[in-house]
Amino acid sequence: KMALMLYYDLYISAGEYDSLQLMFNRLSEDEFFADEVCQLTEILMSRCNALEQDDNSAFRDSFPLKLHGVYTKAQIQVAIETSTLQKMSPSREGCERNTLNGIPMEAMFVDVIKDREEGSNTNYKDFAQTAVKFHWETQNSVRQESPTGQSYIKGSREMLLFVRKQRNAAENKYRTLGYVYLGKVTLDSFEGNKPMQIVWNLKTPMPGSVYEYAATLANV
């Protein structure tokens, strides 16, 4: 999976190669490219300050993501197997579902500061209440009695939370930000309909850097 994650770092669409081995063979033939990649890897590793931990979900034995690591959405979609070498996930929603190792799961993608489209009435209230509790709103169509609502209430899916400050920001030269993987969450409480308001319990406390913006910037 990590090789496929690298593929989506290098290419913006699926199907550029018939196999990952062919990709590596082609890239290794370009000595200049190989040297540049080695140099870039060293630079990025020296800049990396994320204190990653082992995954805490049911998928920990085969999951390529590290708890509190930072990942692009494309990388996450590879990890949850909604993107393959020949087909890229078309999802642009804030949630994505699949079944991994026979276990139904759902990935929640949260921007604390929303990038609202002009004329949109959508303003989800997603924020950290504490370092281990996260308030999250479903999509506007979800009711408690709906299949989706019931899956949240009954805990029939392994829920994984991914959070970032916002999609892009001036301090990051408007580059798209990655998501911090906060790991497995379980239901604490719920109320309301269309949307439902849910509080999730984090199995592992979120990093202080995430809590700082997730608790204070939600209403910006």
In which residue ranges do the predicted regions lie?
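C-terminal helical accessory/scaffold domains
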Residues: 1-63
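Detector for methionine-enriched segments
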Residues: 2-5, 23, 45, 88, ...
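Intrinsically disordered, low-complexity N-terminal regions enriched in serine/proline/glycine
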Residues: 6-10, 123, 178-180
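Short linear sequence elements within intrinsically disordered, low-complexity coil regions
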Residues: 12-16, 22, 29, 37, ...
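Acidic, glycine-rich low-complexity segments with interspersed aromatic residues
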Residues: 66-178
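Compact mixed alphabeta submodule
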Residues: 171-220
